[in-house]
């Protein structure tokens, strides 16, 4: 590195003090936000390189600026590793985020005003799957599909019937808060039945797909998008995969020049590192442990009747819990748990009755604690603390004791 930490602190103490404070917070908190993780030092090192200095509009071998021969090597490494990891023929590693990756797919495959089907936000979908406040809902005619009200699982027969009724040009599968395995083969059958494209947003489960613990959407989807953080444990960014050469050309044009200018090559370098890490056999064990830890926490909540785990459990890295029999709403639960240094987010549940600013539920995820080396025993203990804190949210002495117990645990599992 060009400067060391002391150089930074001397130049900008206000900023570095904030960074130090965040480092302390991450070390001393149990992180259960399902979309967050702990990246490796190698990922951070790559993202902090002088690659940030270089403009490289275009793609490897087809740049608009000179001096990009080395940049081409970096980006090609990321592309080839993504293709190998997910078994895809084409990969675009330039999207700055998952949202921009999704926007590029929409721009490539459909026109403004076209009908699209996506998962309802309260059922577990994502803002970019048609939420009215998102560009997706404002630009396209999104029709939401839901989960079954009783089982809280995807009902593929109902989705097929709905697709036959609305005749979408595109069907979006994937979720940000759905705890069960998604049957991508079924979704492809539905898409084929109505002549629609199928796009899968696997942002949340990409790491589990990579580790072999969730079926891959790549053989079934016309296009697959993902983020490179979350369970994939890389830098914040996006990635697009396809096996169709014609679609790949459209996607490349949609990303650049359609949506973005120069790619963030320092971030792409960090993506390459994360993809290499995911190709390592050790990553399979990580994916297995992520699922075991989530299941262990869900099992604890299932043993306490005042908490209701949505759909009864989990097969991936997250689950939702209805907390309204214990506290007023999910926002209150989030705040109570933050008092004991357990961080998660309030979350809508299927057929939500409260506003998204309050919600009936919380979302619990295991990727970050698993990256710190915590296992099923620690996961169960964390869930027990959560239950105890929420049931005793009006007892400061209980919260103080739990906060101390959390500190002992986080000290035993250093962030780095």
From Swiss-Prot:
<dbReference type="InterPro" id="IPR049943">
    <property type="entry name" value="Ser_HO-MeTrfase-like"/>
</dbReference>
<dbReference type="GO" id="GO:0019264">
    <property type="term" value="P:glycine biosynthetic process from serine"/>
</dbReference>
<dbReference type="GO" id="GO:0030170">
    <property type="term" value="F:pyridoxal phosphate binding"/>
</dbReference>
<keyword id="KW-0963">Cytoplasm</keyword>
<keyword id="KW-0663">Pyridoxal phosphate</keyword>
<feature type="binding site">
    <location>
        <position position="121"/>
    </location>
    <ligand>
        <name>(6S)-5,6,7,8-tetrahydrofolate</name>
    </ligand>
</feature>
<dbReference type="InterPro" id="IPR039429">
    <property type="entry name" value="SHMT-like_dom"/>
</dbReference>
<dbReference type="InterPro" id="IPR001085">
    <property type="entry name" value="Ser_HO-MeTrfase"/>
</dbReference>
<keyword id="KW-0808">Transferase</keyword>
<comment type="similarity">
    <text>Belongs to the SHMT family.</text>
</comment>
<feature type="binding site">
    <location>
        <begin position="355"/>
        <end position="357"/>
    </location>
    <ligand>
        <name>(6S)-5,6,7,8-tetrahydrofolate</name>
    </ligand>
</feature>
<comment type="subunit">
    <text>Homodimer.</text>
</comment>
<dbReference type="GO" id="GO:0035999">
    <property type="term" value="P:tetrahydrofolate interconversion"/>
</dbReference>
<dbReference type="Pfam" id="PF00464">
    <property type="entry name" value="SHMT"/>
</dbReference>
<keyword id="KW-0028">Amino-acid biosynthesis</keyword>
<protein>
    <recommendedName>
        <fullName>Serine hydroxymethyltransferase</fullName>
        <ecNumber>2.1.2.1</ecNumber>
    </recommendedName>
</protein>
<feature type="site" description="Plays an important role in substrate specificity">
    <location>
        <position position="229"/>
    </location>
</feature>
<feature type="modified residue" description="N6-(pyridoxal phosphate)lysine">
    <location>
        <position position="230"/>
    </location>
</feature>
<dbReference type="InterPro" id="IPR019798">
    <property type="entry name" value="Ser_HO-MeTrfase_PLP_BS"/>
</dbReference>
<dbReference type="GO" id="GO:0004372">
    <property type="term" value="F:glycine hydroxymethyltransferase activity"/>
</dbReference>
<dbReference type="InterPro" id="IPR015424">
    <property type="entry name" value="PyrdxlP-dep_Trfase"/>
</dbReference>
<dbReference type="InterPro" id="IPR015421">
    <property type="entry name" value="PyrdxlP-dep_Trfase_major"/>
</dbReference>
<comment type="function">
    <text>Catalyzes the reversible interconversion of serine and glycine with tetrahydrofolate (THF) serving as the one-carbon carrier. This reaction serves as the major source of one-carbon groups required for the biosynthesis of purines, thymidylate, methionine, and other important biomolecules. Also exhibits THF-independent aldolase activity toward beta-hydroxyamino acids, producing glycine and aldehydes, via a retro-aldol mechanism.</text>
</comment>
<comment type="pathway">
    <text>Amino-acid biosynthesis; glycine biosynthesis; glycine from L-serine: step 1/1.</text>
</comment>
<dbReference type="GO" id="GO:0005829">
    <property type="term" value="C:cytosol"/>
</dbReference>
<keyword id="KW-0554">One-carbon metabolism</keyword>
<comment type="pathway">
    <text>One-carbon metabolism; tetrahydrofolate interconversion.</text>
</comment>
<dbReference type="InterPro" id="IPR015422">
    <property type="entry name" value="PyrdxlP-dep_Trfase_small"/>
</dbReference>
<feature type="binding site">
    <location>
        <begin position="125"/>
        <end position="127"/>
    </location>
    <ligand>
        <name>(6S)-5,6,7,8-tetrahydrofolate</name>
    </ligand>
</feature>
């Amino acid at each position: 590195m060009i400067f060391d930490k002391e150089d930074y602190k001397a130049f900008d103490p206000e900023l570095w003090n904030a960074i130090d404070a965040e480092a302390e917070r991450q070390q001393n908190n149990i992180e259960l936000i399902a979309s967050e993780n702990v990246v490796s030092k190698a990922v951070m090192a790559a993202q902090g390189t002088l690659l940030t200095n270089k403009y490289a509009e275009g793609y490897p071998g087809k740049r608009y600026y000179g001096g990009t021969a080395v940049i081409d090597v970096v980006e090609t490494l990321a592309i080839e590793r993504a293709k190998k990891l997910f078994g895809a023929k084409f990969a675009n590693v330039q999207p700055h985020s998952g949202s921009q990756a999704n926007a590029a797919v929409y721009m490539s495959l459909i026109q403004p005003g076209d009908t699209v089907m996506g998962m309802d936000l309260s059922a577990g979908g994502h803002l970019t799957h048609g939420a009215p406040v998102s560009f997706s809902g404002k630009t396209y005619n999104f029709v939401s599909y839901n989960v079954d009200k009783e089982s809280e699982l995807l009902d593929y027969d109902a989705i097929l019937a709905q697709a036959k009724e609305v005749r979408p040009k595109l069907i979006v599968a994937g979720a940000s808060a759905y705890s069960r395995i998604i049957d991508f083969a079924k979704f492809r059958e539905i898409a084929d039945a109505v002549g629609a494209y199928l796009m899968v947003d696997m942002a949340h489960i990409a790491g589990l797909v990579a580790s072999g613990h969730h079926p891959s959407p790549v053989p079934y989807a016309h296009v697959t998008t993902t983020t490179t953080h979350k369970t994939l444990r890389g830098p914040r960014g996006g990635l697009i995969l396809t096996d169709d050469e014609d679609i790949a050309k459209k996607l490349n044009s949609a990303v650049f020049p359609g949506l973005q200018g120069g790619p963030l090559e320092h971030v792409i370098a960090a993506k390459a590192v994360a993809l290499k890490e995911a190709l390592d056999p050790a990553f399979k064990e990580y994916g297995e442990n992520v699922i075991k830890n989530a299941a262990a926490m869900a099992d604890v909540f299932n043993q306490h009747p005042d908490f209701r785990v949505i759909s009864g459990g989990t097969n991936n890295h997250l689950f939702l819990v209805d907390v309204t029999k214990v506290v007023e709403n999910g926002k209150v639960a989030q705040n109570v748990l933050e008092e004991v240094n357990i961080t998660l987010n309030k979350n809508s549940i299927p057929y939500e009755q409260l506003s998204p600013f309050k919600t009936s539920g919380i979302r619990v995820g295991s990727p970050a604690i698993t990256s710190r080396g915590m296992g099923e025993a620690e996961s169960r203990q964390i869930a027990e603390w959560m239950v105890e804190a929420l049931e005793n949210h009006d007892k400061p002495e209980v919260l103080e004791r739990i906060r101390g117990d959390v500190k002992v645990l986080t000290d035993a599992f250093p962030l780095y």
